[in-house]
Amino acid sequence: MTLSTSSSPASAASAASSAFAPIPLWRQLQATATVLVAIRAGQSATTALNGVETSLRPGVQALVFHVLRGLGQAEALRRKLANRTPPPPVDALLCIALALGWREERGDDGGLFYDPFTLVDQAVEAAKRNPATRPQASFINACLRRFLRERDALLEAVAGEPMATWNHPRWWIDRLRQDHPRRWRDILQANNTHAPMALRVNVQKVSQAQYLRTLDAMNIEAMPVGAFGILLDQARPVQDIPGFLDGQVSVQDAGAQMAAPLLLRGLDLSQPLHILDACAAPGGKTAHLLELAGAQAHAHVTALDIDPVRCERIHQNLDRLG
């Protein structure tokens, strides 16, 4: 097997913690607002998060994912609180606080829980410490305090808006209703649910059954999914996953684990394989191709990605997996 490359949540609360010193919430809110502005401008969340300071990234990633799941509701609330759309950095910070505020009360996805007044205080502090938002700090404070006073009435006022109800873009909701008239609500509801942490066993090193026995011996609850996958009952940091550092398993969504076997199923494995993975980072499917093809055929995989930073992850993952 050969490979050539070219450039190209544990829970949110635990992800937000630091091993050394507590990071003020206002700093995380600032960084989350910067990421949200980038996403609204067309960047992927992954690309935007790569620009976040390393010490802040785990907590900010948790906040970003949490906020995006509630962004439709937050934007609807902001429209009730402000007659005009504020400048992007201000709007991002306000919507983030609203998303965390209303979801804090519901707690419908096991997410973050902040005291509402602490959240307002830290959002205003974040605004004051950024020159781009400092002039609007009083505006943010007024909007958020009004939300606290009128929360029930405001939530009721936006309850009939599809984007507020489902936290998806309107075009997406309309398309799902058209394509899946009987199940569109179930699909949207599932999209708003935290995905379980899925692992893929490296069949060059361990079988699914063997790894499940390892987890059972360590009192880690898990269940098999598909031919190579394992769903953990509770997410955990990768360094705490047995065998992760030794390359026995990778973190990979169960759906993504279907790509490599589906491709190989349609190829003649009696012949040498030359495979192009044109969107390879961080290398999960590339590694899976090599793991499976290596047991059946000679495979040369060329892995490409447009992002040089993420392309480095391909090398790191392949080195770890061996």
Predicted regions and their residues:
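S-adenosylmethionine
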Residues: 1-322
